[in-house]
Amino acid sequence: MSETAKKVIVGMSGGVDSSVSAWLLQQQGYQVEGLFMKNWEEDDGEEYCTAAADLADAQAVCDKLGIELHTVNFAAEYWDNVFELFLAEYKAGRTPNPDILCNKEIKFKAFLEFAAEDLGADYIATGHYVRRADVDGKSRLLRGLDSNKDQSYFLYTLSHEQIAQSLFPVGELEKPQVRKIAEDLGLVTAKKKDSTGICFIGERKFREFLGRYLPGQPGKIITVDGDEIGEHQGLMYHTLGQRKGLGIGGTKEGTEEPWYVVDKDVENNILVVAQGHEHPRLMSVGLIAQQLHWVDREPFTGTMRCTVKTRYRQTDIPCTVKALDDDRIEVIFDEPVAAVTPGQSAVFYNGEVCLGGGIIEQRLPLPV
């Protein structure tokens, strides 16, 4: 290894993607070390929390690859900058995306600073399925090569400066290739299933978890025609377009379409439902977004044509974006879209390039 080899700290989660990322960087000649972040303090004896197992897996991978593993506890930062905001959004009747907040506040802020200042890193690396490309002296965020696994939606808040300090080795690969590399290397994470759900809730019941921190306020479930047909246990447990867990059965005779949440009246604590997943009340012609983050950090003025995702794994929607002021934009879709949800993120693309995004403040309903 040459004296000038750049030092990279890989965020080791105990999963297959970060494991293979570390090996790929070794192959590319970097001086590689790992960092395991503990972001959540679980109660003793809670089986669902896999932090200890994840740390053991991360350590086993680092031992196998011959690299040092550092650990750091960001639980206080996580609580203050991610979790408190997550609860506040739910309390206001919106549906936040904590993974996006975690990337913004922890992985590409607290971790990036810790790696550079405390560990002397030139770069950090993560197992995200995204790519970076440097154009005109600025780093751009691109979709991952594996369109099925692309995670650019979760990283839209990053600036070109943060991307310039970050490496995404698996973004250039397809997921099956990543698993194959891990198997060939005999890594313990090769067959480990991908983590799902919100990191601090893990596999456990979301409703039960949320209820610990926010007491539910029961209220009426009303149809779009104004008929009361049931009771909800708290608006925060429901999101637009939701069908399961309403407790009102599919339909009266079982012949009609099932009920879907089409609106939340936060002021009166009423959940509004309608039948059919393409009910006009569920459709939006556009949205207003705020808290904007553009990757190039240039203020957006005027209008542009691009595509948008209003949730992860959604097909790109062609749209026109218009600046309303410094921090708000209006987005008009070419075709109406179902279940556009305030609190979630709208993320914009120009082909492979992720331009940035913002938080959906309100949806623009289909004119009745």
UniProtKB/Swiss-Prot annotation:
It catalyses: S-sulfanyl-L-cysteinyl-[protein] + uridine(34) in tRNA + AH2 + ATP = 2-thiouridine(34) in tRNA + L-cysteinyl-[protein] + A + AMP + diphosphate + H(+). One of its GO terms (biological process) is tRNA wobble position uridine thiolation. Residues 149-151, 311-312 are annotated as: Interaction with tRNA. It is found in: Cytoplasm. Disulfide bonds join C102-C199. It is an enzyme of class 2 (transferase). Keywords: ATP-binding, Cytoplasm, Disulfide bond, Nucleotide-binding, RNA-binding, Transferase, tRNA processing, tRNA-binding. ATP binds at G11, M12, S13, G14, G15, V16, D17, S18, M37, G127. Its EC number is 2.8.1.13. The active site is at C102, C199. It comes from the Bacteria. One of its GO terms (cellular component) is cytoplasm. Its main location: cytoplasm. The record marks H128, Q344 as: Interaction with tRNA. Residues 97-99 are annotated as: Interaction with target base in tRNA. One of its GO terms (molecular function) is tRNA-uridine 2-sulfurtransferase activity. Interacts with TusE. Catalyzes the 2-thiolation of uridine at the wobble position (U34) of tRNA(Lys), tRNA(Glu) and tRNA(Gln), leading to the formation of s(2)U34, the first step of tRNA-mnm(5)s(2)U34 synthesis. Sulfur is provided by IscS, via a sulfur-relay system. Binds ATP and its substrate tRNAs. This is tRNA-specific 2-thiouridylase MnmA.
